Swiss-Prot record:
Gene Ontology biological-process entries: intracellular protein transport; late endosome to vacuole transport via multivesicular body sorting pathway; vesicle budding from membrane
Coiled-coil portions: 21-175
Chain positions covered by the region annotation Disordered: 1-21, 168-210
Biased composition (Polar residues): 174-184
Transmembrane region(s): none
Lineage start: Eukaryota, Fungi, Dikarya, Ascomycota, Taphrinomycotina
InterPro entries attached to this UniProt entry: Snf7_fam
Keyword Zinc applies: no
Family the entry assigns: Belongs to the SNF7 family.
Gene Ontology cellular component list: fungal-type vacuole membrane; multivesicular body
Keywords, in A-Z order: Coiled coil
UniProt protein name: Uncharacterized protein C162.06c
Domain of life of the organism encoding this protein: Eukaryota
Organism expressing this protein natively: Schizosaccharomyces pombe (strain 972 / ATCC 24843) (Fission yeast)
């Protein structure tokens, strides 16, 4: 069958906006180069016309300059169209990208809403309130337990007069022990506030043998 009717030509992939913009920019660059060359030719013709006397020669130069100028105008118009097309495609690309981002955001929001809806079915306000009450009960019980454990276990009723009498007895005993310790020390170890008495004696001079 393919031999009789032939094959369909392969389908070319559709160019993206980015590829189309790049192609337009390259064409614009090429046209700008051509316009620059025509400007250079016009400059040369202007010099030649200025240096040529009026007559057939100058008329021919002017005619050639007019042709170059006409080509320049055509290329300038073409360049303007290419730049406008490129600008329009850039705007379309930006709009397309913005729409993609918007759609992605909407899809994300829809998925989030779906998950929240699914999860909210498993959440009961009554269960949460009951759980909070239970937690509060546990905390209150723990606070009471800590309060009991923190009570002073050495709170014994003692008469203050007995404590004063015992303290006075301890002071008297300490004073008596101090006196006994002083009595047992030798006299030379006892502190004294008197100055020592020294015997001043004259030292005998040695006799000189005659």
């Amino acid at each position: 069958m393919h031999r009789l009717f032939g094959r369909k030509p392969p389908t070319q992939p559709t160019a993206s906006l980015t590829d189309a913009i790049d192609s337009l920019d390259k064409r614009s660059d090429s046209v700008e180069v051509k316009i620059a060359k025509l400007d250079a030719q016009l400059s040369v013709f202007q010099q030649k016309i200025a240096n040529t006397r009026p007559g057939p020669g100058q008329t021919a130069l002017k005619q050639r300059a007019m042709n170059v100028l006409r080509q320049k105008k055509i290329y300038e118009s073409q360049l303007q169209q290419l730049q406008q097309q490129s600008f329009n495609m850039e705007q379309a690309a930006m709009t397309t990208e913005s729409l993609k981002n918007t759609m992605a955001t909407v899809q994300t929001m829809q998925e989030t809403a779906r998950q929240l809806k699914s999860q909210s079915k498993n959440v009961s306000i009554e269960k949460i309130e009951k759980l909070q009450d239970e937690i509060q009960d546990y905390m209150d019980a723990a606070g009471e337990l800590n309060e009991v454990l923190g009570q002073n276990m050495t709170d014994i009723n003692v008469d203050e007069e007995e404590l004063d009498a015992e303290l006075e007895a301890l002071q008297q005993e300490s004073s008596w022990l101090g006196d006994q310790s002083t009595a047992e020390k030798p006299s030379y170890l006892m502190p004294s506030n008197e100055l020592p008495n020294f015997v001043d004696e004259e030292v005998a001079e040695p006799s000189t043998a005659q």
